[in-house]
């Protein structure tokens, strides 16, 4: 398993009294929709399950590279590599050095919005938007694995979702979503802009021009035209954009022109992808589809990666927006992904050249993932909330254990709590860990499921006089409530903790004696972890935490 090192302590240990040791962490996914064996030559959707939104893709020779948005999590913008579009391996992150960004004080759904990856003349380029933390930027590298350059800011470019296009003559252009010219006509009225881009100075040059005002039909008041990408095929320039907002009305539209500057005419069959016209209440729904990026294969076929979500009820999903893959059909010079009313398939025929036996774990399908904390650096799946300002995670001081140094910044803060999270990738899952009891009072530690600072669970343990108590706290809004607690004996044996999910219901268990799991709270309504209730753009993450105890009844 590839490893990364930006979260690990090297030389600045915190006070030993604040240290809590974790022996292992395990995540198991058991979604019924993934239980059916794959037919030979087929793959599963999503190809990246869990909080992997806003995919962008490029091809270099026979290899494909893909990036996703991460918002206020760190490291930022994972970079994946594949040889067949189905099996992906994370090879790096565009932002993994602490000095590159500062997310302090930001909500979890601010920070790193959608990025775009392209390759030109032996170099990779990623452009993106660090919302409320610098704005639009460009970074580059000779290898997708990095190291990536420092971020070069683009102060003259407003809006979000920048994307680079390289024409056949080598000219570079920067597209982005921005305000329309003049006064917006309605809420959600945006425009797609384009400007030449100088790769030597990493800055746009020359005049900017609106390529698309509002959407494909301004009279219908389309909202949130965004995620623009430009492609060239058979003498046409194709402009593809997301329209309708990243929710149930999400869609993808396409336009084309003989001239890179336009004018661009819409396809006769827009949108080329949406799920908004499907029946509500259908079994195993996939919704919110859009934010497409296209890529061609060496044999001339085209494929689309895009985001979509898997609700467990209504528009509630705790897994966030995920990355899906579908083939593109070209008809009469226009691309099409799905016809109107067609559902996104969970199983589809794999691209040409994919091995007959497909194993997409641990990024799709049902699987068990375990970290025994045996390596000196964290596995790439681990994320922190915002950029660490101190070294609170340590895999070196005690080999085979993860030591977290408790911090006063808790899960409800907009700072950097001592919390390592991995993405919840299934609606039916079990996450568990084993830890030693904190050596002193005033420290809570355990296992957390986090959506944002006002939506999380913490299943933990704290010293209480001569004993200890196991508790489960729930944050729903601005108040933290203890759902259940029970006293346990103080022993030297590790305490096991478990959070399990069944759609919108989560259960919490512990084992303090080695004699088996005991339920602390069962079937609690966890819909506050869904985007529909919590707001924002991220999915849930789950993992170990340690914090210095504040007043437990404090209300923010």
Which stretches of residues belong to each language-model region?
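N-terminal export signals
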Residues: 1-11
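Carbohydrate-active catalytic/glycan-binding domains of CAZyme proteins
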Residues: 12-556
């Amino acid at each position: 398993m590839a490893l990364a090192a930006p979260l690990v302590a090297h030389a600045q240990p915190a006070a030993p009294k604040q240290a809590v040791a974790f022996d292992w962490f395990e995540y198991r996914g058991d979604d019924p929709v993934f239980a059916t064996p794959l037919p030979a030559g087929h793959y599963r959707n999503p190809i990246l399950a869990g909080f992997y939104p806003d995919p962008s893709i490029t091809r270099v020779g026979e290899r494909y590279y893909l990036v996703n948005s991460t918002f206020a999590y760190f490291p930022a913008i994972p970079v994946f590599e594949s040889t067949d579009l189905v099996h992906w391996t994370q090879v790096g992150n565009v932002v993994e050095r602490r000095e590159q960004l500062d997310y302090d004080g930001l909500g979890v759904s601010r920070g790193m919005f959608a990025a775009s990856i392209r390759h030109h003349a032996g170099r990779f380029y990623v452009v993106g938007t660090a919302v409320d933390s610098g704005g639009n930027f460009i970074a580059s590298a000779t290898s997708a694995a990095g190291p990536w350059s420092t971020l070069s800011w683009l102060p003259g470019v407003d809006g979000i979702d920048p994307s680079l296009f390289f024409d056949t003559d080598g000219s570079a252009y920067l597209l982005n979503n921005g305000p329309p010219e003049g006064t917006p006509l309605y809420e959600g009225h945006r425009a797609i802009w384009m400007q030449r881009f100088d790769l030597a100075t990493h800055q746009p040059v020359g005049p900017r021009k609106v390529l698309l005002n509002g959407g494909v039909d301004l009279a219908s008041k389309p909202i949130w035209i965004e995620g623009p990408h430009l492609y060239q095929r058979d003498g046409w320039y194709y402009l593809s954009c997301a329209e309708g907002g990243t929710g149930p009305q999400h869609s993808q539209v396409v336009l084309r022109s003989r001239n890179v500057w336009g004018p661009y005419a819409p396809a006769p069959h827009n949108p080329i992808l949406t799920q908004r016209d499907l029946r509500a209440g259908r079994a195993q729904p996939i919704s919110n589809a859009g934010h497409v990026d296209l890529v061609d294969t060496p044999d001339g076929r085209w494929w689309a990666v895009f985001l979509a979500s898997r609700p467990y009820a209504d528009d509630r999903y705790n897994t966030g927006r995920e990355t899906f893959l579908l083939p593109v059909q070209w008809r009469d010079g226009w691309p099409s992904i799905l016809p109107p009313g067609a559902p996104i398939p969970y199983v589809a025929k794999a691209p040409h050249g994919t091995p007959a036996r497909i194993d997409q774990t641990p990024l799709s399908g049902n699987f068990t993932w375990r970290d025994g904390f045996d390596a000196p650096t964290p596995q790439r799946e681990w994320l922190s909330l915002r950029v660490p300002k101190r070294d609170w995670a340590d895999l070196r001081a005690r080999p085979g254990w993860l030591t977290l140094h408790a911090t006063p910044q808790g899960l409800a803060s907009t700072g950097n709590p001592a919390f390592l999270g991995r993405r919840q990738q299934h609606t039916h899952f079990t996450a568990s860990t084993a830890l030693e009891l904190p050596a002193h009072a005033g420290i809570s530690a355990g296992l957390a499921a986090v959506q944002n600072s006002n939506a999380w669970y913490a299943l933990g343990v704290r010293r209480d006089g001569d004993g200890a108590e196991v508790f489960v706290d729930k944050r729903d809004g601005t108040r933290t409530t203890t759902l259940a607690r029970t006293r346990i004996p103080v022993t030297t044996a590790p305490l096991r903790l478990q959070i399990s999910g069944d759609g919108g219901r989560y259960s919490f268990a512990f084992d303090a004696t080695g004699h088996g799991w005991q339920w602390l709270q069962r079937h609690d309504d966890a819909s506050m972890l869904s985007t529909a209730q919590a707001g924002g753009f991220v999915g849930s993450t789950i993992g170990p935490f340690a914090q210095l105890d504040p007043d437990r009844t404090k209300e923010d």
